Amino acid sequence: MWLRLGPPSLSLSPKPTVGRSLCLTLWFLSLALRASTQAPAPTVNTHFGKLRGARVPLPSEILGPVDQYLGVPYAAPPIGEKRFLPPEPPPSWSGIRNATHFPPVCPQNIHTAVPEVMLPVWFTANLDIVATYIQEPNEDCLYLNVYVPTEDVKRISKECARKPNKKICRKGGSGAKKQGEDLADNDGDEDEDIRDSGAKPVMVYIHGGSYMEGTGNMIDGSILASYGNVIVITLNYRVGVLGFLSTGDQAAKGNYGLLDQIQALRWVSENIAFFGGDPRRITVFGSGIGASCVSLLTLSHHSEGLFQRAIIQSGSALSSWAVNYQPVKYTSLLADKVGCNVLDTVDMVDCLRQKSAKELVEQDIQPARYHVAFGPVIDGDVIPDDPEILMEQGEFLNYDIMLGVNQGEGLKFVEGVVDPEDGVSGTDFDYSVSNFVDNLYGYPEGKDTLRETIKFMYTDWADRDNPETRRKTLVALFTDHQWVEPSVVTADLHARYGSPTYFYAFYHHCQSLMKPAWSDAAHGDEVPYVFGVPMVGPTDLFPCNFSKNDVMLSAVVMTYWTNFAKTGDPNKPVPQDTKFIHTKANRFEEVAWSKYNPRDQLYLHIGLKPRVRDHYRATKVAFWKHLVPHLYNLHDMFHYTSTTTKVPPPDTTHSSHITRRPNGKTWSTKRPAISPAYSNENAQGSWNGDQDAGPLLVENPRDYSTELSVTIAVGASLLFLNVLAFAALYYRKDKRRQEPLRQPSPQRGAGAPELGAAPEEELAALQLGPTHHECEAGPPHDTLRLTALPDYTLTLRRSPDDIPLMTPNTITMIPNSLVGLQTLHPYNTFAAGFNSTGLPHSHSTTRV
């Protein structure tokens, strides 16, 4: 900080004192030094006009200044008739546009009940601070911020820390290594010049939230840009009602927030070269909901050619909250609240356009727990089909992908039922699992089996009575289901055909009062390390007590992330070396982050003791991926396999299925409405909240009949699969034995090919005898797909009352029970030509 001195006195003195002369001299020197160090404001041309930014120094000797261009428009304001429509390119401007202030944020409301379970801890713990970032929202909000490094200081700082007498250090320290400067004087060091001397890689950050809130203004990309020598871009996109409202037809197709992101990427691809960026090395990255957006962008053919790599932090398109399968339901609720619920969807949308943005975003529309009210939808265009189907079809194989999870992502799911001092009681544990099953899976006939199996899998039987152990396993339950399993499945599908894939597990978090002391690395805890916050100290959003270890780990993470943006390999070109920060050797120097593949499933453990490990939580991933979908429909198999098992009588004590919050505590999540499939008979057996339920039963002694039923059910399932496997193997063996007998003679077989007869022969051979009646329940080809059980996973990701998946050419998200909407049209029948921007919704849904 400059020493601020006042001007000298104008009174004349025949004999000025020495102190006055010294003061005057220092004042002039200060002015001269300030004038000499003040760099001119940087300017840059774009296709739409000229921008004036600001050169901002960073408060660290190892970080060079960054040119910031804030509030750059990437699309026309989506206001008036353009609300609920895809974005259009921005208008051009004359003269020089000032880009030195953050733009307005998109309309949102954080004063209602925010879905804390999907938001990072640093967001929910600082809502008062977050509110200062979203003041004065405006629908004219489609802007981005560009952070451009001016010096490549990381390598020179490390060299000067180790060899302060080197010539490049004597020339002016970190400021000596200017862009384009010749570093021939490398003193013979082999790895002296490892920087990008040409166009710089570009990293575009998609902010998270819950699709309802957030802004790119909250994240400063300066440190990441300076340390990693990359251009970092943050952006705003429409959120909530304005970004994701959908009527399920052409009136309002939805996905406007995703289309904003695509338009921003198009702007970056066309203009980043003016900033010194490389349009052929654009990486999109995000955390949480932002990661889900990144995952969805890799599956949309409208993103093709706009970026080459993706970093998916703690999220996936396969998570239950990634896609909204019931948009019409929540659109109807919103229309009811604001007086626009008319039968014709076009009239409904016109009515919603007449409402103010404030009135729309202030409506409290709460989704089912673990789902979203307004988010991306399967529209047959931007998202052509269910994300898992698109992944299986290889839609994202052209991208290099790095993805991972944090150790304790599910903290917020547990905090509401946990006493930080005492852990989780047995009753709380049982209630949490029951509530989880009810809200996520609805009320299937096999709910009891599903619930008890989950409780069985997440009980530490060596320490089952320890409340702290229950707390740990409960966090693991939510972490595994909501983050780990979707991420691992995404990695498996991407790496199946050899596409570059890297997986990590983040095990570190800063010390702060935002979280309980017992918590691990929670959702969003990797964000400050990715953006280098420990290097400059605590901030308003990240009030942590950062140590040298935090600074070192942040440097490591930024090196991995920017290396991946540069080459697609997090190990190169910049090696892990942080001796200029920490005197101790960096353990990451000896760790090589291996590629992920479905067989070995290698991943990097990111923490103070890094190591490459394999098969991250493989047992739990297999449980959620394979067994739970099978148990979800297990009752269907019992109809024809369980003929000797006696069904236990219904429990009349209401103790095993009670959903009342024990000990008088309140539970913030409402039980979903009973679906039509839930019979009156079952409803009569449920607990009535208006009547006195009596005291809860003590946990011990415990009735193990349910666990025994679960064991028998699982055993029956495995026996059934073994029968199928034996039948398939027997058939293949018998077929091979008969192949020589079926081989036609050369004279008879020369006239007609064998291909035409093969399907009929296989079909006849698959018709087994009467002793194999279990195998006749489905088509033959389903019987032999032993490694691919009936895929109920798509159903389980949906809300309890969702409809089955239909073909991409039909509406896939409208419940049959919704009354009052007109007949909808296939997505490939839109009239072309209403949108001249080259954006989606005017194109065919068929990829050429």
Curated annotation (Swiss-Prot):
Location in or out of the cell: Cell membrane; Synapse
Keyword rRNA-binding: no
Tissue: Expressed in the blood vessel walls (at protein level). Detected in throughout the brain and in spinal cord. Detected in brain, and at lower levels in pancreas islet beta cells.
Membrane disposition: Single-pass type I membrane protein
Disulfide pairings: 106-141, 340-351, 510-544
Extracellular side: 38-709
Transmembrane regions: 710-730
Modified residues (Phosphotyrosine): 792
GO terms classed as biological process: adult behavior; axon extension; chemical synaptic transmission; inhibitory postsynaptic potential; learning; modulation of chemical synaptic transmission; neuron cell-cell adhesion; positive regulation of excitatory postsynaptic potential
Phosphoserine sites (modified residues): 745
Role, per record: Cell surface protein involved in cell-cell-interactions via its interactions with neurexin family members. Plays a role in synapse function and synaptic signal transmission, and may mediate its effects by clustering other synaptic proteins. May promote the initial formation of synapses, but is not essential for this. May also play a role in glia-glia or glia-neuron interactions in the developing peripheral nervous system.
Assembly information from the UniProt record: Homodimer, and heterodimer with NLGN1 and NLGN2. Interacts with neurexins NRXN1, NRXN2 and NRXN3. Interaction with neurexins is mediated by heparan sulfate glycan modification on neurexin. Interacts (via its C-terminus) with DLG4/PSD-95 (via PDZ domain 3).
Name of the protein in its database record: Neuroligin-3
Organism, as annotated: Homo sapiens (Human)
